[in-house]
Amino acid sequence: MRLIIFGPPGAGKGTQAGLLEERHGITQISTGDILREAMAQETELGQKAKSYIDAGELVPDALVRDLAEQAIADEGHDDFMLDGYPRTDQQAEWLTEFLASNETPLDGVLSMKVPDDVLVRRLSRRRVHEETGETYHLDHDPPPEDVDPDLIVQRSDDEPETIQNRLDVYREETAPLATYYEERDLLVPVDGTGGIEEVFGRIEEALDALER
């Protein structure tokens, strides 16, 4: 299947996409992860992206598109789930045309629905290991007891005072994608509240419905 998963920060997109890859073989394509990996490996695209980031500039949309295109091609244009892309109607239109040119249209777009108060709690309870980058959650995935607590920190964008701004940006820039895909009969709303396995069960039900 060819899928997109999107929703506000804290909706659990990455967690659920990872489970789909682990249990159903649907490869998670996270443009953020791809970008970081490309820079770490110093690929041509990665070096270009790093030059913008080092200069304090946003990575151009065309460069992100190139990364997404290569990742999709690497998967043979099938059995993938995009996480973090597209973010705008313009990106969605490009993706539609790109997939159509390969006769591999999307099968569905999972839209994660979570109330703001739940999002704020999820995000404000996330922690990261300062040295390894390993992420944890104080409620359902706390750091092991043998980890130095002084190295467990909160990301600046997960601090309560910045979370609302992130949600506002999401609504302004990304939420309109729901309309774009709803008009194309691809949107599948998913209740993202509850435990990880509970939400995953709803996603599996949604995928079963798409396959029928």
UniProtKB/Swiss-Prot annotation:
GO terms for molecular function: adenylate kinase activity; ATP binding. It is found in: Cytoplasm. Pathway: Purine metabolism; AMP biosynthesis via salvage pathway; AMP from ADP: step 1/1. It comes from the Bacteria. Residues 125-158 are annotated as: LID. GO terms for biological process: AMP salvage. InterPro entries: Adenyl_kin_sub, Adenylat/UMP-CMP_kin, Adenylat_kinase_CS, ADK_active_lid_dom_sf, P-loop_NTPase. Its EC number is 2.7.4.3. GO terms for cellular component: cytoplasm. Residues 30-59 are annotated as: NMP. Keywords: ATP-binding, Cytoplasm, Kinase, Nucleotide biosynthesis, Nucleotide-binding, Transferase. NCBIfam families: adk, PRK00279.1-3, PRK14527.1. Monomer. Belongs to the adenylate kinase family. Catalyzes the reversible transfer of the terminal phosphate group between ATP and AMP. Plays an important role in cellular energy homeostasis and in adenine nucleotide metabolism. This is Adenylate kinase. It comes from Salinibacter ruber (strain DSM 13855 / M31). The lineage of its organism: Bacteria, Pseudomonadati, Rhodothermota, Rhodothermia, Rhodothermales.
